């Protein structure tokens, strides 16, 4: 959407860097959307004397042939939002929960790029120019990936992107080239199997060399002939400027960061990752028993059943927690989560949490492939003294709709405090 420049991040007016921000859309984003202070300042919004909010109007370019006026305002706490007109803009372009948007300000216009649940750039109006021939960078195909646990050493290219933009001749190649933000080119092996197409050998080394880590979001712009140019956004949504910030570059020396394996029974980073610290697991779950004479204690049988729900989790820029589901969880319709984990992501009071599942379905045709869609459930998250819980009718419905069984493992990745992506590892 809108006109866009190079992902490398050029200068704006008067030599100032152009403000860029990546946002993930949560249910509340469709009424108003929080933006960073730098972007708000470039849109002309500051805090007046006495802390009184100031408002401005941003000109948002749309490929649908209309220029949208969207209000920018700070609330009483000084936080900046896109407000009046934003809900109409989002509805007109079909933006959805779990999508990513990139906001770029330049030339007096706010441009918006939207990546849907396929992780591909959503095309509005005319399709992107044929890969390799486009001279306007805004017309080149793009996709993004969130670096989550388990995909650091091998990254899957979205099936839709492969089907739409990568030719059969290119797929016969065993090598892709990545143009890094430092101006270097990297050769990465192209792996293919029945499940999809991946960036394989050399990918982890590329990440390690550039200091790109878990929780970062990488956007790939396709130059054609298996050549990709990338830009990187940190978990705070700000684009990383490798040159200006002097990010330390290091070679893998045997101590490079390793993606956690969900088959392991502990995590390597003791400061950020913990196993079996479900603080509530040795406590009686709320509303789970009646009239116990040993308050605060569980029977040996109950303790044994509850131990199976212990978790592996990581607290970090892109926090995640892995939980094994057992009969106790399904019968009681309540799932305990480690107190430390909940506190770290800002879940400190009862909240409505959106659980999102990405569904991939096979498509028919000469080239085959798959398409993706998202489904979501509203679940109550409740904080108690020693733990927090997902519970109630929403959690029951989630389990029923997804056929969750005893022995399955749910991996919750926190995209936002109240928006979690869920992947289910079947037993």
UniProtKB/Swiss-Prot annotation:
Residue ranges with Basic residues bias: 263-273
Major place of residence: nucleus
Region (Disordered): 253-309
GO molecular function annotation: DNA binding
Localization per record: Nucleus
The name this protein goes by in its record: Putative B3 domain-containing protein Os04g0346900
Phylogenetic classification of the source organism: Eukaryota, Viridiplantae, Streptophyta, Embryophyta, Tracheophyta
GO cellular component: nucleus
Superkingdom per UniProt: Eukaryota
Gene3D superfamilies for the chain: DNA-binding pseudobarrel domain
Ranges in coiled-coil conformation: none
DNA-binding span(s): 25-118, 140-236, 320-427
Record key words, sorted: DNA-binding, Nucleus, Repeat, Transcription, Transcription regulation
Transmembrane segments: none
């Amino acid at each position: 959407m809108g006109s866009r420049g190079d992902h490398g991040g050029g200068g704006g007016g008067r030599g100032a860097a152009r403000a860029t921000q990546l946002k993930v859309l949560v249910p509340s984003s469709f009424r108003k959307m929080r933006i960073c202070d730098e972007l708000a300042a470039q849109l002309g919004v500051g805090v007046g004397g006495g802390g009184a909010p100031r408002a401005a109007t941003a000109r948002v370019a749309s490929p649908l042939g209309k220029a949208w006026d969207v209000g920018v305002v700070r609330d009483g706490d000084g936080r900046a939002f896109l407000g009046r007109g934003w809900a109409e803009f989002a509805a007109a372009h079909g933006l959805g929960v779990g999508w990513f948007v990139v906001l770029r300000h330049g030339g007096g216009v706010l441009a918006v790029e939207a990546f849907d649940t396929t992780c591909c750039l959503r095309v509005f109006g005319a399709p992107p120019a044929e890969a390799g021939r486009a001279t306007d960078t805004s017309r080149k195909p793009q996709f993004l990936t969130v670096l989550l646990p388990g995909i650091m050493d091998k990254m899957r290219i979205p099936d839709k992107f492969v089907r739409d933009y990568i030719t059969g001749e290119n797929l016969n190649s065993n090598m892709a080239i990545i143009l890094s933000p430092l101006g270097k080119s990297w050769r990465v092996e192209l792996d293919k199997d029945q499940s999809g197409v991946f960036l394989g050998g050399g990918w982890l080394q590329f990440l390690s060399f550039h200091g790109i880590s878990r929780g970062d979001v990488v956007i790939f712009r396709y130059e054609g002939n298996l050549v990709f140019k990338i830009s990187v956004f940190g978990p705070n949504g700000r684009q990383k400027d490798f040159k200006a910030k002097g990010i330390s570059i290091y070679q893998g020396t045997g101590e490079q960061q390793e993606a956690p394996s969900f088959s392991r029974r502990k995590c390597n980073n003791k400061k950020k990752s913990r196993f079996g610290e479900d603080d509530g697991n040795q406590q009686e779950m709320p509303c789970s028993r009646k009239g116990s004479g040993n308050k605060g204690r569980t029977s040996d049988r109950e303790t044994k059943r509850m131990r199976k729900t212990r978790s592996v989790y990581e607290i970090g820029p892109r926090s995640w927690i892995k939980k094994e589901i057992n009969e106790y969880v399904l019968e009681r319709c309540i799932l305990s989560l480690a107190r430390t984990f909940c506190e770290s992501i800002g879940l400190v009071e009862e909240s409505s949490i959106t659980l999102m599942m990405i569904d991939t379905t096979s498509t028919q045709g000469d080239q085959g492939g798959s398409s993706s869609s998202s489904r979501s459930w509203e679940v109550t998250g409740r904080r108690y003294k020693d733990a927090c819980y997902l519970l109630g009718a929403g959690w029951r419905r989630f389990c029923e709709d997804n056929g969750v069984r005893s022995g399955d493992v749910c991996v919750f990745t926190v995209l936002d405090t109240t928006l979690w992506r869920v992947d289910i590892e079947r037993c």
